[in-house]
């Protein structure tokens, strides 16, 4: 199952999940792409988002307004839906209207592969881009070990380029886990590194769990600010 967390009152871009792109709300673009891979449920704190989701034929559940992260919202939704402990859940960010179904599929396949692992808490994806294009702190960087497990995530440029570096790994905002591991993640204490970087995935690494990564090819960008919308080619939605 794919669960899309959708908070209406975004700090940097209020009501962004309902912002129209070619006349269709952003979250609906995301949901339509995700629905090519698996069943989609939208988890939101807004009756308005609930109504719009249903108008476009998507199931939605109403969750608390007090959640500090999308993962907490997904966790509540999974509980409300009564999902089994071993159910595979893919968390797709609402502000990824360009997310390719193939990216979601790869993360789902990786999550299934690690379902029985006690050390892999979650799975995610990354893409390689030019090192010169990584100054934006909203583009989260990830360094990996030899088996594509995450060593660290940062908003800074990592690794530091003491020598010539042509490409760097950019983390994509998608997560896969079992409901059991999702619940475990949400019960872990917030980590100091997580608070510094404002990256919740660092919580898993801090507490000794591992994050499995898969390389993908993707043109998707997360919409964090109104300026990000200018980067989107409207023809993608035609």
From Swiss-Prot:
Keyword Kinase: no
Localisation: Cytoplasm
Any Pfam family: CTP_transf_3
InterPro entries linked to this entry: Cytidylyl_trans, KdsB, Nucleotide-diphossugar_trans
Main location: cytoplasm
Annotated metabolic or biological route of this protein: Nucleotide-sugar biosynthesis; CMP-3-deoxy-D-manno-octulosonate biosynthesis; CMP-3-deoxy-D-manno-octulosonate from 3-deoxy-D-manno-octulosonate and CTP: step 1/1; Bacterial outer membrane biogenesis; lipopolysaccharide biosynthesis
Keywords assigned by UniProt, alphabetized: Cytoplasm, Lipopolysaccharide biosynthesis, Nucleotidyltransferase, Transferase
Molecular function terms, GO-annotated: 3-deoxy-manno-octulosonate cytidylyltransferase activity
Source species, domain of life: Bacteria
EC nos: 2.7.7.38
GO biological process entries: CMP-keto-3-deoxy-D-manno-octulosonic acid biosynthetic process; lipopolysaccharide biosynthetic process
Gene3D superfamilies assigned to the protein according to its UniProt record, in alphabetical order: Spore Coat Polysaccharide Biosynthesis Protein SpsA, Chain A (3.90.550.10)
The reaction(s) this protein catalyses: 3-deoxy-alpha-D-manno-oct-2-ulosonate + CTP = CMP-3-deoxy-beta-D-manno-octulosonate + diphosphate
GO annotation, cellular component aspect: cytosol
Role according to the record: Activates KDO (a required 8-carbon sugar) for incorporation into bacterial lipopolysaccharide in Gram-negative bacteria.
UniProt record similarity statement: Belongs to the KdsB family.
HAMAP family: KdsB
Name of the protein in its database record: 3-deoxy-manno-octulosonate cytidylyltransferase
